[in-house]
A protein has these predicted regions:
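ATP-binding glycine-rich loop module of kinase domains
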Residues: 8-47
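Conserved hydrophobic "DFG−1" position in protein kinase catalytic cores
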Residues: 24-25, 36, 65, 74-77, ...
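C-lobe/activation-segment region of protein kinase-like
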Residues: 109-112, 124-193
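Conserved structural core of kinase catalytic domains
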Residues: 58-99
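Structural motif at the C-terminus of the N-lobe alphaC helix and the adjacent alphaC-beta4 loop
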Residues: 49-59
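Hydrophobic residue at the +6 position relative to the catalytic HRD Asp in the kinase catalytic loop
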Residues: 116-121
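Protein kinase-like catalytic core scaffold
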Residues: 32, 59, 73, 129-131
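Conserved hydrophobic core/spine positions of the Hanks-type protein kinase catalytic domain
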Residues: 99-106
């Protein structure tokens, strides 16, 4: 028997439970993501983050509705490839790197510090989706420029990051510092002139 959930007089059929608080659901042949919150503060932070990210220009799954009483939200279900998984095969397409720099630029301009690690992004339909729905107050770009940006290229920092997550990657594919710095410099000039 198919389990159904009703939110604001709309019925959704549960297709799959993704984790403890997330479900893939379907309504009228379209897939959605149902997120349940058990903590009121976390739900309010999600609602605030969803709004701030949406108006900033950072692409994230569209939120169709949320129920403040139940602390549930219905979002677009994004099927695509996680950028960390894409990078494990060697390198990311230039289009993905362009979109990554744009996401950082939008965040910086709206004073939002988002977690720029590649496993927080999914590439689908020509868009780069930021999945966590979290942000901090932006103070400066040094952490991204000197740290996280190197995780978007096949660098020794990327290999170390993967190993810290228990992911085995081929260290022989590591790009030279010269090649990585050249790519970073070219992308930076393109977006920050």
């Amino acid at each position: 028997m198919v389990e159904e959930i009703e939110i604001k007089r709309k019925s959704y059929q549960i297709v799959e439970q993704l984790d403890e608080n997330s479900f893939k659901v379907e309504r009228k042949g379209k897939l959605f993501l149902l997120k349940k919150y058990t903590d009121k503060a976390a739900f309010e932070k999600f609602v605030d983050a969803e709004h701030r990210l949406r108006v900033s220009g950072i692409t994230n799954p569209k939120c169709y509705l949320y129920d403040k009483k139940l602390m549930w939200a219905i979002l677009d279900y994004v099927e695509g490839e996680n950028c960390l998984d894409m990078l494990k095969s060697g390198s990311l397409p230039e289009e993905v790197l362009d979109l990554m720099f744009k996401a950082f630029w939008y965040g910086r301009n709206d004073r939002l510090a988002i977690d720029m690690k590649p496993d927080n992004f999914i590439y689908a339909n020509g868009k780069l989706y930021y999945m966590p729905f979290t942000y901090e107050k932006y103070t400066n770009n040094e952490y991204f420029v000197q740290g996280d940006i190197r995780l978007w290229f096949y660098t020794k920092e990327f290999v170390k990051y993967c190993h810290s997550k228990g992911i085995d990657v081929d260290a022989s594919l590591v790009k030279s510092d010269y090649e990585t710095n050249k790519n970073i410099a070219l992308m930076t000039v393109k977006y920050y002139r």
